[in-house]
Amino acid sequence: MLSLSQPCFSGTLLMLLASNFLLWKNVAPVPMYASLDEYGEMSIYDLLDHVTILSHNVSELTAEMHRIFMEDVRYKPGRWFSDRYLTACHTSTLTISVSKEGARQMPGVFLVKEMISMLTAWRYPLYHIITELSYMEQAPDEIISRARNIEEKIIVLIEALRGILSKIQPGPPENERYPVWNELASLQSPDEDLRHLTLFNLFQCLVKDSRKIDSSIRLLKCKLLYNRDC
């Protein structure tokens, strides 16, 4: 069961490395491009295939991480969470839908910008999820390894989407805006139940958002390749 009472470091590094290695072996190989310039050398078709695979990987990993978390906490008396405990996600202002404003832009531009904003909004909370999990006594390695993997893939996915945006809207990059997560105090609270409730909310929101991204990328692919309402 998860506990934040004492840090437990014995053998953690080796187990994390092993877990990450096994996790990567079970995921379809996806090329990791380091910069926007390198993405510029890819065709729009290859980029769309690339982000489709990445987003599907992220969606699967978040679902697995959420499942492992729920299985772990259910054995702790009095620590069972339901959807009624779920607070508003910090990304709730991003609907990832084509509004009237978005409809006036070139096909897919508004959608790509919304997805970049949503993914960027998760970088800060994911960093702290990983940090706090690392201090948890008996925190399942499966959760930590997946959280790290998700963080890495989201960074790559953001860059790939920026590459797509540069192709469908050429010109200097615009300033990006994204919702800010402000629940760090709850995640670091001395109240153990509050810490777990905060994790529960984060995992629930991450699952929802990763599914939105996955479905939106399929929509994007349809719009850019076939230029029609999908």
Curated annotation (Swiss-Prot):
Transmembrane segments: none annotated. Keywords: Disulfide bond, Glycoprotein, Hormone, Secreted, Signal. Residues 1-29 form the signal peptide. It holds the Pfam family Hormone_1. Disulfide bonds join 89-205, 222-230. The keyword Kinase does not apply. Its main location: secreted. One of its GO terms (cellular component) is extracellular region. Gene3D superfamilies: 1.20.1250.10. InterPro entries: 4_helix_cytokine-like_core, Somatotropin/Prolactin. It is found in: Secreted. GO terms for molecular function: hormone activity. Glycans are attached at residue 57. CDD domains: prolactin_like. Expressed in both placenta and decidual tissues. Detected first in deciduals cells early in gestation and in trophoblasts later in pregnancy. Belongs to the somatotropin/prolactin family. This is Prolactin-6A1. It comes from Mus musculus (Mouse). The lineage of its organism: Eukaryota, Metazoa, Chordata, Craniata, Vertebrata.
